[in-house]
Structures are given as structure tokens and as C-alpha cells.
Amino acid sequence: MAFLKKSLFLVLFLGIVSLSICEEEKREGEEEEKQEEENEELSEEELRDRRAWLDKLKSLGKVVGKVGLGVVQNYLNPRQ
């Protein structure tokens, strides 16, 4: 009877240990997935920021081009 109790205790102990190891690995996997999602979100935010900067630069380029064109036209065709 004592041998059976010890065997049962050993089986339960090993089962609990393996279960806790599996839970720990599962938590680590979930944390890694969460970090990857955050990195993807950051990448999307960075892309939006870059697009916004490109749009601003494009608008600035248009304004500078118009001003430059006006200066060149005034230089070539001065008003008297």
C-alpha cells in the first residue's frame, strides 16, 4: 500500500511539474506574440508618420516651386 501511495504521489508530482512547464511555455509564447503585434503596430505608426512627412515635403516642394517660378518669371520679364 505504501508503494502504491508513493507511486501515485510521484505520478501526480510529475504531472503537476510538466503542467506548470507547459503553462510557462504558453505564457512565454503569448508574450512573444504580444511583442510582435506591438512591433507591427509601431511599424504601421512609423509608416503613417513617414507618409505624413512625405505629404508635407510634397506640399512644401509645390510652394517652393511656385515661388521659384514666380521669381524666374519676374527676372525674365521685369515690370517697367
Curated annotation (Swiss-Prot):
Residues 1-22 form the signal peptide. It comes from the Eukaryota. The keyword Repeat does not apply. Disulfide bonds: none annotated. It is found in: Secreted. Expressed by the skin glands. One of its GO terms (cellular component) is extracellular region. GO terms for biological process: defense response to bacterium. Keywords: Amphibian defense peptide, Antibiotic, Antimicrobial, Cleavage on pair of basic residues, Secreted, Signal. Residues 23-49 form a propeptide. InterPro entries: Frog_antimicrobial_propeptide, FSAP. It holds the Pfam family FSAP_sig_propep. Has antibacterial activity. Belongs to the frog skin active peptide (FSAP) family. Dermaseptin subfamily. This is Raniseptin-4. It comes from Boana raniceps.
